[in-house]
């Protein structure tokens, strides 16, 4: 995928198909974000595109239908039902539970709207970063909390189904506003009861400058964490179900995502850059009897390693044309001498949403080298001494050997 919206070929080889060949029952519920109906799954129900947070449409093998409720709960219900009533007890299984949350514009469950309302979250140390030492592209994007975050469409200030006003930027995400049109009167009433008084207090304060940025950050970060709370509850329900079915000691549970995110870091929101806040992503695993509880691994891994990992866990053959590396040795506490020393990243979408320019680069355990090739601009960081990537060392003669080595 070089651009968002490219079509996925479901006829090609995939790890779910390979697991089916060795006897696994497979299922997927939730976000697929790949055009076309899933293949390689014995049962499935997926959201159209990004889907909606409230009362989402779901596509089933027999067609599309609306399911009332909050999306995270809906997806979890489908997964729990599959485990309890559709799973074949005589077969191993692979279940993918893929949530919309916390994709922006994030809309929390009604039960979480008051979460964190009585406290201030700690600000990232780079909230007011002005990218003075970065290459020029960092100063010419459209993802600043200060200048680009939309009060209405991003933060729901005074947002109603009838709002429909011009956005602050051409490519503004209006998904939350579109979702409001699907909410029931009861849901809207609860939503307005929570946000109405906060919006009134915001207007009364007439905030400007850094105070306004701080308010935006608090509103944004809290809504993010409220959505994550729903995902956390989902994981808890799934773990509880596995325990009830006496499967918890023989099931590998993996939590991961597709990228990191800026929540005020460097004064930004959204993702796309190669800086660590968006480059890094969570990968948490419970492998009973194999992976030591509470252990951490510092090897460089990528999501292209997942397929080989799952296949090796299942005892399935790994095709030679797969490009990742199985994580099984790392999960067993081993340190392979031939493990990769660096990873490659490439962002293609420009001009596009948030106007982050095209760039590629290499990250090792200590250094990062990036090139914005449309503008012939480079950046180089020592991540040990400068984990926030504030001091661009490209052009520093003392770093020439490190740059060449990277």
Residue ranges of each PLM-predicted region?
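Residues forming the ATP-binding cleft of Hanks-type serine/threonine protein kinase domains
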Residues: 384
């Amino acid at each position: 995928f070089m651009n968002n919206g490219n079509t996925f070929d479901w006829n090609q080889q995939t790890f779910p198909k390979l697991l089916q060949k060795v006897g696994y029952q497979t299922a997927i519920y939730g976000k697929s974000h790949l055009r076309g109906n899933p293949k390689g799954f014995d049962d499935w129900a997926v959201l159209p595109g990004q889907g909606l947070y409230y009362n989402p449409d779901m596509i089933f093998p027999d067609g599309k239908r609306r399911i009332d409720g909050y999306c995270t709960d809906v997806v979890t219900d489908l997964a729990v039902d599959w485990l309890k009533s559709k799973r074949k007890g005589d077969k191993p299984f692979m279940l993918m539970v893929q949530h919309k949350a916390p994709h922006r514009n994030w809309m929390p469950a009604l039960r979480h709207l008051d979460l964190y309302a009585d406290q201030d979250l700690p600000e990232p140390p780079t909230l007011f970063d002005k990218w003075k030492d970065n290459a020029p592209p960092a100063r010419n994007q459209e993802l600043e909390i200060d200048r680009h975050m939309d009060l209405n469409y991003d933060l729901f200030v005074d947002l109603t189904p009838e709002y429909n006003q011009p956005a602050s930027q051409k490519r503004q995400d209006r998904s939350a506003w579109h979702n409001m049109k699907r909410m029931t009167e009861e849901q809207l009433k609860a939503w307005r009861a929570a946000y109405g008084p906060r919006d009134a207090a915001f207007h009364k304060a007439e905030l400007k400058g850094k105070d306004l940025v701080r308010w935006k950050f608090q509103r944004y970060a809290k809504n993010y964490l409220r959505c994550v709370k729903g995902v956390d509850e989902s994981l808890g329900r799934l773990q509880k179900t596995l325990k009830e079915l006496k499967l918890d000691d023989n099931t590998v549970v993996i939590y991961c995502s597709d990228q990191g995110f800026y929540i005020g870091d460097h004064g930004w929101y959204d993702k796309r850059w190669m800086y660590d806040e968006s480059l890094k992503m969570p990968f948490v695993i419970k492998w009973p009897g194999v992976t030591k509880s509470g252990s951490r691994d510092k090897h460089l891994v990528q999501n292209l390693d997942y397929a080989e990992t799952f296949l090796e866990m299942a005892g399935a053959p790994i095709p030679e044309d797969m490009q990742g590396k199985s994580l099984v040795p790392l999960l067993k506490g081993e340190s392979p001498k031939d493990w990769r020393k660096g990873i490659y990243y490439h962002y293609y979408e420009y001009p596009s949403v948030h106007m982050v320019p095209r760039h590629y680069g290499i990250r090792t355990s200590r250094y990062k080298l990036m090139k914005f090739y449309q503008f012939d601009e480079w950046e180089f960081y020592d991540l040990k001494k400068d984990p926030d990537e504030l001091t661009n060392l490209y052009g520093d003669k003392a770093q020439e050997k490190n740059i060449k080595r990277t």
